[in-house]
């Protein structure tokens, strides 16, 4: 299972036709400490560019777009009451959704670095 990253601060992992999407280290840095999150609904069909996640953090209020097309098979519902899990570095905590019927997921469009070629803030 390979982890790929988007420029908008998400990580993506595919296993057995199911794609899990979560908030990467870069996404966490962009938003700051998460205080509120609005998640997609189970069964929702997302297209590339659709709103995947609305998140309010210490640094920004952001609408994060879906990086791939697919159907929401599972939502990490715990995030609604425990949104601080999005601040975790543990992927078992900071995942957002799982998608099936996925298209638009070609690894060439994504990076193998969470910072997508940028330097980490402490390296600047």
Q: What is the role of each PLM region?
A:
Residues 23-27, 50, 59, 76-79:
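Short, well-ordered turn and helix-capping elements at secondary-structure junctions
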Residues 9-11, 64, 72:
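Conserved hydrophobic positions within beta-strands
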Residues 68:
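A cytosolic small-molecule/anion-sensing beta-strand core signal
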Residues 40-41, 51, 58-61:
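Short glycine/proline-centered loop/turn elements that form peptide/ligand docking sites
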